[in-house]
Amino acid sequence: MNYIINLKMDYKDKALNDLRNVYADFDSLPLDFRQILIKDRATLLQKEDVEKKILERQEDAKKYAEYLKQSEIPERISLPNIKRHKGVSISFEETSEDMVLEPRPFIFDGLNIRCFRRETIFSLKNKILNMVKESSSFKNVSRQSVSFMYFKIFNKGKVIASTKSVNIYEDKIDERLEDLCNNFDDVLKKIIDVTYGYESLFVSETYSYVIFYAKSIYFPQPRCVNNWGNNIPNILTFDSFKLFTANKNNVSCIKQCSRFLWQKDFNTLEEMIEYKNGNICIVTPQLHINDVRDIKSFNDIRLYSESPIKTFSVIDNTITYLFYFKEHLGVIFNITKSRHDRRVTKFSPLSKFSDVKNITVCFDIESYFDPEKESNQVNIPFICCASIIYNKVIGNIVDFEGRDCVAQMIEYVVDICGELNISSVELIAHNGGGYDFHYILSSMYNPAAIKNILIRNNSFISFNFAHDGVKFSVKDSYSFLLCSLANASKAFLNEETFKKTDFPHHDLKTADDLYKVYKEWSSVNTEINHVVEKEKLLITSEHIVNFTKNDKSKTLIEWSKDYCRNDVLVLSKVWLEFKNAVEDIFNCELVDQTMTLAGLSYKLFQANMPFDVELRHPNKEDYFNMREALIGGRCISVNGIYKDVLCLDVKSLYPASMAFYDQPYGSFKRVSSRPKDELGIYYVRVTPNRNNKSNFFPIRSHNKITYNNFEESTYIAWYTNVDIDIGLSEGHNIEYIPFDSYGNIGYSWSKKGKIFEKYIKDVLYKLKIKYEKQNNKVKRNVIKIIMNSLWGKFAQKWVNFEYFIKSEDDIDFESEEAYKIWDTDFMLIKKIKESTYSSKPIQNGVFTLSWARYHMKSIWDAGAKEGAECIYSDTDSIFVHKEHFKKNAKFMLNGLKVPIIGSEVGQLELECEFDKLLCAGKKQYMGFYTYFQDGKPCIKEKKRFKGIPSNYIIPELYAHLLSGADKEAKIQFLKFRREWGSVKGYIENKTVKAT
C-alpha cells in the first residue's frame, strides 16, 4: 500500500542541509534518489528530536518530584505516615476482531484497521453501567470509585496506538461514549498525518484491530475468604466443576492455591504465572453474582481482564484455571462437560476436539411482537440460541442477542468451521420451515446466495447457502419427527426432567418488555373464558403465570435465554437420538441423504423392493387423471350427545392397506373396458343411492367428499376399481364413460401383488416388535413413524415449481411471480418447472387410500350388529354404541380370519370407552372416559376441533353448537402468518358452527 509521509518543513530543510554537507554532489543526484534520502534523514531527525524531548520531560518530572517531596505534599507523594488506598478493578474488554459482537467492522479510509461502528460501542452501554454500578455498590471502601474507558489499536499482538481515557459518569454515559468515539477519530487522523512509527497500520498484510477497554476501580478495605460468605467449605461443587476455596484465614490464598496445585509456596500471583509459563486462565463471576454460592454453571463466570490466557471458550487440561472474586483466589478443577439431564442448560465451554469431521447446529429464535396491534405484529428476533454438535457430541450452547442474532450465529459458526477446517454444516430448527428459516432470509447480506429451495404449503422444507467458504444445509426437524418438540422429547428422551419448559411469551410485546423483572415460575397456563353474547358463544383466554416460592428474579431477556437454551438442548438431544437410531437400525446415514421422513421411508422401501417389481411414473396428463381418484380418509359424524360409546382405532391402517392388499406395478395401459381381475382407475358417472346406510363409498357433492349426507344428483369423477366395487355394493349407480377421443375409460395394470408386504411386515414390523421386547422406546418410535409415513411419498403432488431469490432490481415483474422478502431488497421468485413425468408413482398412493376404506368396511361389516350406526369415524377410527358392536367378531385379513380387536397391524385397538360423547361435525368431537390411577377413578377427555387450538376446546363449545341448528361460536386465539423473511402473530377471530 502506498502512503505519504507528512513531515514538518524544518525537518526536511535540516535533512537537506545535512545531506549537502555529506555529499558534495548531492544536487546532481537523480530526483527520486534525492527524495528518498531526504525522507529517510528527516524521519531519523524527527525520531531523535522526539526521544530528546522525552528525556527532557523525564528529567523535569524527577526534579518536580523532589520538590514535592521536600514540600511534603502527601496528596502527590506517599510518605511513610500516609496510608495509600489499594484499588481493585472491575473491567472488561471487547475486540473488533469478535465477529459476534462486531459482524460488520468499518475500515477507516487510508488505514488497514478493522474499527468498531459507533452503534456497536453504544450497544455496550448497559454493560458499562453495570460495571460502574457494581464498583460503586461496595460499602466497605476507603474512597470513592473511579471509572474510565479508552481504545487501543493492536497489530500482531502489539499495541500500536491508544486514545486518552475518558471518565465514565452514569448520568452522562451517552455524552462520554460520544467523546470517546470522537477521540478515536482524532487519533486515526493524527496517525495519517504523522505516519512515522505507524507504518504497520498502512502496509501490514494483516488487519489491525481495535480493543475497547472499560475499567472501574474501587478501593476496598483488606479482605479474606470470609467475604465469600460465612463457613465456606474447602471445596464447593458446582454443575460442571469444583472450586477449591482456600478457606484458611491464617494462610494467604496465593500460598494455599499453589500448595493445592503443585505443593509449592508461592507468595504472588506473578510467581504462579511464571511457574506455568503463562499457561493460566483466571476467571471471575458475572457481574450479577454477589455470592460465590450463587454460581450454578459456566454461564455464571467470565474471563478476568488480567488473565494471561485470553479465552475461556475451549477447555484445555494443560491450562490451570484460577477463580478470582472479591480479592480472594481459588482454584477451579475437575472440569467436566455440562450434564444434559437438567431442566435448563446454560453455556458450557467446548472440550478440545482434534478430529471433527461433521458439525450440526440446532438453533431456535425467540422474538417479541404485539398480536393486538397491527403495526407491531411482525415477530422481531431478539435472541438466537445455538447448540453446536461436533461429530455426534453436543458441545457448547451459545446465545446471540439483538435484531441481527441470526446473522451473528452464522458468523460464529463460520469462525468455528475455519478453526476446525470444516467446509459444510447441517443447520436444524424445529418447525424452522414455518418460522426460524424465514429469518435466515432476512438476516443475510445477500439472500440470493440461497439455493435449492424446497417449499411445501408456504413452508420451507430445506435449502442451502454458502457463506465465507462454508456450505450450510438447512433442514426442518419437524419434517422428520412429525410432532411438537414437547412430544418429541417424550418420545425420544429418557430423562424425565429433560423436557421443554414454559415461557410467558404473552408479556413480550415490545423491546422494552425484555427488561421487565420476573420472579421464577413453575408453569404458564392458559385459562379459557367463555360467555354467550347475542346467541353467540365467545371463547377467549388469559395467561396465568404460576410463580415459585423462592425470591429468584431476573429480567425476561435473561429468563428467555434459559428457556431458549433449554429448547435447543432438547432439540439437539432429540435430533441425535433420532439420527443415531436410524443409522444404527439400518446401518446407513439415511437422514443426511433425505429432507423429510417420507423421503427417508421411500428410500428404505427402494432398498427393499422385490427385484422383479417396477413402479412406472405416469406422464403429466395421466398423473392428474389418476390423482383425481386420490381421496383422503373417510370422515363422518352423526351429530349429537351420546353415552356408552366405544372408541376404536385401527393399528397402523395405512401400512396395513399397503402390506395386505394388492398394489399395481409394471406398465399401465389405457383401456376402453374394465379388464377382469386387474387393478384400474376409471372415469365414471355416478348417481348416488340415498337409501344406502353403509357409507363407505366417497360421494362427491358440492366439490366436497361426503359419505352420509348427499343429494341424488349425478356427477362425473375418477375412482379406483376398489372404490367402484364398494359403491356398487352399496347400491349406487356407476357407469364407465370415455375420457379421451379414443373411447378409453381409464387405466389398468396387468400386474398386481403385495409388493409392500416384505418391507412392512418382514422388515419394519419385525423390527418394531424386536424393540418393544427390548423396551427400546427410541428405536420403536423411529420404526413406527417410518412405517406410517411411507404412503405419503406415493401421494406426492406434481412438483412443477422451482424457487430462487433475486434482487428487486433484476426482476421482470411482467413475467416473474415475485414475493417480497421482509426487510430486504430481495424477492422470492416462483417459476414453473416443466416435467414430462411425475417424480413418484401416484397410482400406489391412490390405491393405498382406497384399500384403507375397504379395510374399514370389512371391519365394520364383521363387527357391527344389525341396525348399528357409526356415530363418528375419521380415517382409522370408529365410534359406536357399546351394545351395537361385536368385540369378539373376526374378519378376513391377508387370507386369514383374524379377530377384529387385537394388537397386530390392521386390527382394531380399544382405545377407551366414552361415558359421554359430544359430536358437532367432522373433526369436531369431545369424549369423556374413566380410568383408574392408584385405585381411584379419574376422568380424561379425548377431543378434536379442526382449526382450533386444543386448550380452547371446551365442553361448553359443543353444548352450545348442539343446542340449535343456527348456533355459532367465536373463538379468539393467537395465530401466525408467514410472510417471506418474517412471521406475523395476530389474534384470529374464528367463527364455527356444527357441520
UniProtKB/Swiss-Prot annotation:
<keyword id="KW-0808">Transferase</keyword>
<dbReference type="GO" id="GO:0003887">
    <property type="term" value="F:DNA-directed DNA polymerase activity"/>
</dbReference>
<comment type="similarity">
    <text>Belongs to the DNA polymerase type-B family.</text>
</comment>
<dbReference type="InterPro" id="IPR012337">
    <property type="entry name" value="RNaseH-like_sf"/>
</dbReference>
<dbReference type="InterPro" id="IPR023211">
    <property type="entry name" value="DNA_pol_palm_dom_sf"/>
</dbReference>
<dbReference type="GO" id="GO:0006260">
    <property type="term" value="P:DNA replication"/>
</dbReference>
<keyword id="KW-0238">DNA-binding</keyword>
<keyword id="KW-0235">DNA replication</keyword>
<dbReference type="Pfam" id="PF03175">
    <property type="entry name" value="DNA_pol_B_2"/>
</dbReference>
<dbReference type="InterPro" id="IPR043502">
    <property type="entry name" value="DNA/RNA_pol_sf"/>
</dbReference>
<dbReference type="GO" id="GO:0003677">
    <property type="term" value="F:DNA binding"/>
</dbReference>
<keyword id="KW-0614">Plasmid</keyword>
<dbReference type="InterPro" id="IPR017964">
    <property type="entry name" value="DNA-dir_DNA_pol_B_CS"/>
</dbReference>
<dbReference type="InterPro" id="IPR006172">
    <property type="entry name" value="DNA-dir_DNA_pol_B"/>
</dbReference>
<dbReference type="InterPro" id="IPR004868">
    <property type="entry name" value="DNA-dir_DNA_pol_B_mt/vir"/>
</dbReference>
<keyword id="KW-0239">DNA-directed DNA polymerase</keyword>
<dbReference type="GO" id="GO:0000166">
    <property type="term" value="F:nucleotide binding"/>
</dbReference>
<protein>
    <recommendedName>
        <fullName>DNA polymerase</fullName>
        <ecNumber>2.7.7.7</ecNumber>
    </recommendedName>
</protein>
<keyword id="KW-0548">Nucleotidyltransferase</keyword>
